[in-house]
Amino acid sequence: MEVLREKVEEEEEAEREEAAKRAEWARTEKMMRPVEVRKEETTLTQEMLRDLEKKLSEIQIPISAELPAFTKDTIDISKLPVSYKTNTPKEEHLLQVADNFSRQYSHLCPDRVPLFLHPLNECEVPKFVSTTLRPTLMPYPELYNWDSCAQFVSDFLTMVPLPDPLKPPSHLYSSTTVLNYQKGNCFDFSTMLCSMLIGSGYDAYCVNGYGSLDLCHMDLTREVCPLTVKPKETVQKEEKVLPKKYTIRPPRDLCSRFEQEQEVKKQQEIRAQEKKQLREEEERLMEAEKAKPDALHGLRVHSWVLVLSGKREVPENFFIDAFTGHSYSTQDERFLGIESLWNHKNYWINMQDCWNCCKDLIFDLGDPVRWEYMLLGTDKSQLSLTEEDDSGINDEDDVENLGKEDEDKSFDMPHSWVEQIEISPEAFETRCPNGKKVIQYKRAKLEKWAPYLNSNGLVSRLTTYEDLECTNILEIKEWYQNREDMLELKHINKTTDLKIDYFKPGHPQALRVHSYKSMQPEMDRVIEFYETARVDGLIKREETARTMTEYYQGRPDFLSYRHANFRPRVKKLALSSAESNPRPIVKITEQFFRNPAKPAEEDVAERVFLLAEERIQLRYHCRDDHITASKREFLRRTEVDSKGNKIIMTPDMCISFEVEPMEHTKKLLYQYEAMMHLKREEKLSRHQVWESELEVLEILKLREEEEAAHTLTISIYDTKRNEKSKEYREAMERVMHEEHLRQVETQLDYLAPFLAQLPPGEKLTRWQAVRLKDECLSDFKQRLINKANLIQARFEKETQELQKKQQWYQENQVTLTPEDEDLYLSYCSQAMFRIRILEQRLNRHKELAPLKYLALEEKLYKDPRLGELQKIFA
């Protein structure tokens, strides 16, 4: 505070000198001005002050009509620990230091608002704000970075407005209470987020300042949804191709240059008019979207988080609004000023002017002129001293004395009074309160759900609208999780009715993207695949009513493209009967990549099967040193004529253009073998096109079944949802329980009731040992007999009741209704089950009773307490 006091005294002295100069200048100017001007000057009277006070009192401060359900009266404090209800001596000392600091600040800066130092907690106990922060590193890897932490806090908590928008809250609850009730104001949000960020290693601070109306009310209706912002496309500069030496000159341009210039002028005028209309429309929309003037602009209290650069490789300072989880630059106009900030170690007051919002603030907390700290010993280093200042403290004794003085004045911040912040896996997975949250953006609405809350796996939906009133839907995006069909995103365009499904790797058909307007077959659609998951290397398949195009990659035959043209069916059969009545193929076009193992003049680049015209066209790859490629065309004829005579290959059946003709390619045998090979390839291509049609039908049928079932996958580690794992765990628990009962049974002391009849500590005689052994065996034998009789009695009782029921059924069989017969059959089934179980238990008891008797007898002989028996049988 010494630096602050010196600074304030210097400013007051400068203000007094300036006021004296200003008064003297005003008197001189007043004497020089005319009388008429001097008459117009007025001073503020008591009546004018009362009128001003009345006008100011008429300003309505908008306070939320709904009282927040999260108040100190709704919190159960009976189960809170002692640290919440009392203060330690060190905390009491800290509160005294804070009060002294606040008094000095109020005395030296009377125009500033009171400091937000020690609000009450949920137990009505004052706690210093720095001790309310509890640095915590969450056990979830997703919460290790600042963006995921901020988004979690924004989703997990529900925003509650401040009771008074012009003042900080009177209560600041612990993060454990805020997590328990999932509600809080901006200070609760910031405290929670700052605790998580500090625990994750960030240099984070809670800020007490002023924000805009939208920021304080979490109003995002004038902000664009981040999910709708498209990434900027990088424009690649086209490299200028240098003209080759021997190139064909372009034809001479015979168009009129005057007409071209006039057309260019006309197009420029049209574009200028369109730009003007577009600019006017944008201005109109901006005027409609512009926020209304806020009477309390610059006065609304808000809290957010400041993250300084340095730790965790943060390149520059930035703000985080805990309400939305969005990050902002420190130059953002939404943040209008800062009063103070704090972390878990110290508290700082902003001594800089915020007339230009936070744009000119320098966040060097080690500068005591700009940031006044409350406690010494902060981790923020002070400003470096100049050489003149440094020359005066070269003596070692002075340095030691200075260190002792600082050590005496320093005060360590007490540990946080808040319990360890814990988020259960169930709460972390649920995220939003009650599993759902809705956020309204500008022309968009974002809905979020917890995983497994919706039966179809829907976790998020973004609805984009055309107008600001959000009435006309443009498109819908839906995100899914844990789908068995690996569906990740569904994009629906309401304008074109186009639907696009995106899949993660693992679909049975290796689907990646499916674009369609209708699930009916032979309609316009585009299907993309994960080519690494397919044997045939298919990347994409485009289908229309008359065409089908396929793109391949990584095939051993170097096929890259196949395009099939169809004609309408002769008979109008059902579309789903493509297997029995496929679409007639008119043309098949196939393209191939370059095969380096073959010479270019023998490597086919494109082949076209014209089925209706019975022709096959080939185009070969072009050599690097050539500008034209070889071509061939075969006239495909039947092997026999109408009379059954075999047709011989003739030269007119092959038309070829060869860049470098070779002798063997002119022979009819070569051409005949090539045509026979192409016939086989044509048959194979037709079969592959037919298989592609069947695969499309299979994919559509599978997608309809998946959409109807929308089965969700459950991890084997999710023991609460995984039924198989749950049944296995319950079975293991039953086995362990039965094993425990068997162990208890083996550890029963059969002699204890009989030894209790004798005086304690008395040594057994031989006669007493024999008598105890006989009594124990006879008692055990009687219990075995009683158990057998009990089972036999239950067996006979069940048998008699069943016989009576059967006799009753024989007597009343004619008058019985179907319901009575069903009840009778059900009873008989249950009775027979009980009789069968009792019979099995009785038979097992008869088998095990002698063995149990002999085992007990042997155990008694070996019991050290009946040592006399061992002497008898020794």
Swiss-Prot record:
Belongs to the DRC7 family. Residues 1-22, 386-410 are annotated as: Disordered. Residues 386-400 have a biased composition (Acidic residues). It is found in: Cell projection, Cilium, Flagellum; Cytoplasm, Cytoskeleton, Cilium axoneme; Cytoplasm, Cytoskeleton, Flagellum axoneme. This is Dynein regulatory complex subunit 7. One of its GO terms (biological process) is flagellated sperm motility. Component of the nexin-dynein regulatory complex (N-DRC). Interacts with TCTE1/DRC5. Interacts with DRC3 and GAS8/DRC4. Keywords: Cell projection, Cilium, Coiled coil, Cytoplasm, Cytoskeleton, Differentiation, Flagellum, Spermatogenesis. Component of the nexin-dynein regulatory complex (N-DRC) a key regulator of ciliary/flagellar motility which maintains the alignment and integrity of the distal axoneme and regulates microtubule sliding in motile axonemes. Involved in the regulation of flagellar motility. Essential for male fertility, sperm head morphogenesis and sperm flagellum formation. It comes from Macaca fascicularis (Crab-eating macaque). InterPro entries: CEPT76/DRC7_peptidase-like_dom, DRC7/lobo, DRC7_C, MORN_DRC7, Papain-like_cys_pep_sf. GO terms for cellular component: cytoplasm; cytoskeleton; motile cilium. Transmembrane segments: none annotated. The gene is DRC7. Residues 1-60, 257-297, 688-711, 781-807 form a coiled coil. Residues 401-410 have a biased composition (Basic and acidic residues).
